[in-house]
A protein has these predicted regions:
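N-terminal "arm"/small-domain region of PLP-dependent enzymes with the aminotransferase-like
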Residues: 1-40, 45
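PLP-dependent aminotransferase class I/II
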Residues: 2-7, 18, 30, 47-53, ...
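Phosphate-binding glycine-rich loop
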Residues: 38-87, 100-105, 111-113, 178, ...
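Structural detector of well-ordered beta-strand residues that form the stable sheet scaffold
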Residues: 64, 89, 110, 162-164, ...
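PLP-dependent aminotransferase-like
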Residues: 78-167, 174
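Hydrophobic/aromatic ligand-binding patch that stacks against planar heteroaromatic rings
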Residues: 100-102, 155, 179, 196, ...
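Conserved active-site segment immediately N-terminal to the catalytic lysine
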Residues: 165-198, 227-232
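Short beta-strand-to-turn element immediately C-terminal to the catalytic PLP-Schiff-base lysine
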Residues: 189-190, 204-209, 249
Length: 378
């Protein structure tokens, strides 16, 4: 079917936050004006209100706001009792911050391959990787798809491992009735601007049902203080900025609607792109309800498809073309090419298509049409 001139002109950025921010702008500005008048710039009522609301949203007792998702992971591991040299099993296919959190907390990352069925931790590989120094397992709910946490809980219980979740891309996602953030002892979330729940700068949070762990993270984020000038721990400066807490509090009530919008777009992509060319669509295991942070398709030459779409006004992304174990920063792990075949295949073949709340139906259809056009199936 030939496209009209109007359809040919449709531009699709990889991410457009305008539709999200425009209806919230007046309320956010009013809240910031109130903050200025109160001078409660750090650890004040606005922060506590957001922490309470986000904990309720996740289904946990506690939420501790921190400066980033990386800090949430790092401080969560420290508060959970990681010791120098403790091994932490984690997926080879992830953003590098997962590895950074482990080493910055004094641990040793033990990557394992991911499964073809969800691109997350292969639970069988986790069990095979457990050794005498293994203390933690760190599942990453990549692209908004939960790892198989029910099976992972069984393995962790059998070997005495502590689960700390990297839920930085999984706000509101569920699998087998388990909500992101509730599968382990603690979970880290990122509120980087492009996340399903995003701030207007860097921000993060740790959620948990463990009151002692939450108290330790509160101390760690504030120079190790449990009381003014009483430093029980060597800590950090990692507070969640109050202006970001204000932004997040305004956005949180809309998270479910925004996630529903992402699901709608994912469904259109699925209907329009299934069976096209050599594309493999994102796998969704039975019982999984992804948050669709990213919509990553597999193809033999993602760079070529990305270039084709770019010339037609459609932006794409790569998540992630270089696995951490093949990055110079992690050469000391001694894991060369071929160590994790599924991870390395995904790194070579994945291309992320635009998916975000407020994406117009014409934009979604334009993506479908142009991808089909590339494969000669328009």
């Amino acid at each position: 079917m030939l496209m009209t001139g109007a359809r040919r002109a449709v531009k699709v950025p990889f991410l457009d936050l305008g539709p999200v921010h425009e209806p919230l702008k007046a309320g956010i500005l009013a809240d910031i004006a109130e903050l200025i008048d109160s001078s409660a710039f750090t650890n004040g009522p606005a922060l506590r209100r957001f922490e309470t609301a986000f904990a309720r949203s996740c289904g946990t007792r506690e939420c501790v706001g921190v400066a980033s998702g990386l800090d949430a992971l790092r401080l969560g591991l420290l508060a959970a009792g990681i010791e120098p040299g403790d091994e932490v099993i984690l997926p080879a296919h992830t953003f590098v911050a997962t590895f950074e959190a482990v080493t910055q907390a004094g641990g040793v990352p033990i990557p394992v391959d991911v499964g073809e069925d969800d691109y997350n931790l292969d639970v069988s590989a986790v069990e095979a990787a457990v050794g005498p120094a293994t203390r933690f397992v760190l599942p990453v709910h990549l692209y908004g798809q939960l790892a198989d946490v029910r099976r992972l809980q069984e393995v962790a219980a059998a070997y005495g491992l502590t689960i700390v979740e990297d839920a930085c891309q999984a706000h509101g996602a569920e699998r087998d009735g388990i909500r992101a953030g509730t599968a382990g002892r603690a979970a880290a979330f990122s509120f980087y601007p492009g996340k399903n729940l995003g701030a207007m700068g860097d921000a993060g949070a740790l959620v948990t049902d463990d009151d002692h762990l939450a108290g330790a993270v509160r101390a760690l984020r504030e120079h190790g203080q449990r009381a003014k000038h009483v430093h029980d721990l060597e800590g950090y400066t990692s507070r969640l900025d109050t202006i970001q807490a204000i932004v997040l509090a305004r956005k949180l009530p809309r998270l479910e609607a925004w996630n529903a919008d992402r699901r709608r777009i994912a469904a259109v992509y699925g209907d329009g792109l299934r069976g096209v060319g050599d594309l493999t669509l994102p796998p969704v295991p039975d019982g999984s309800d992804p948050a669709w942070h990213l919509y990553a398709v597999r193809t033999a030459d993602p760079e070529a498809l990305g270039r084709f779409l770019r010339t037609r006004g459609i932006a794409t992304g790569r998540h992630y073309p270089q696995p951490p174990h093949l990055s110079p920063a992690w050469a000391w792990l001694g894991l060369g090419r071929g160590a994790f075949p599924v991870t390395e295949a995904l790194a070579a073949e994945l291309l992320s298509l635009p998916i975000y709340p407020g994406m117009a139906p014409a934009q979604v259809q334009a993506v479908v049409h142009r991808v089909r056009e590339y494969f000669g199936d328009a």
